Amino acid sequence: MLCISNIMLEKPNKGGIMRYGKIGVATAMAVGAAVGYAVESGKWFITVIAVLAGVALLSLVKRRVDEVVEDERTVRVGERASRRTVEIFSIGAALSGAVMLALDLHTEAALALEFAVCCVLVLYLIFYGYYSFRALD
């Protein structure tokens, strides 16, 4: 920061958290609109392109953020929230699927729920094993 008499001149900020947030909201809206159009028109490849472009744009913008975006507490809260989400989804979806299968209601949906639970648990085990042997940053 450079002070000239009573006027303070600051270096222009390349990108702050607020700017990242605004671009993130705009990107989410654009991706949502593109996905809506793709579903309506039946063109699945538009969805893939829109999501990949949105992820790439957010990645580029986040690299330019100079401020601290998260601290240790934020990371720990995210870890706990993620773990509870997986636990609650797995238990709820497994029970819902089992009840639906037992009552012979919407068999395809029940099997999809059970399959989703299996996939989530397999992914959890893969990541747990990966991070068990890898040094945590």
UniProtKB/Swiss-Prot annotation:
Coiled coil stretches, renumbered: none
Keyword Transferase: no
Subcellular location(s) of the protein: Cell membrane
Primary localisation category: membrane
Protein name: Uncharacterized protein AF_1792
Topology term for the membrane: Multi-pass membrane protein
TM region(s), chain numbering: 20-39, 44-61, 86-105, 109-131
Organism annotation: Archaeoglobus fulgidus (strain ATCC 49558 / DSM 4304 / JCM 9628 / NBRC 100126 / VC-16)
Highest classification ranks of the organism: Archaea, Methanobacteriati, Methanobacteriota, Archaeoglobi, Archaeoglobales
InterPro entries: DUF2178_TM (IPR019235)
A GO-annotated cellular component: plasma membrane
Keyword annotations of the record: Cell membrane, Membrane, Transmembrane, Transmembrane helix
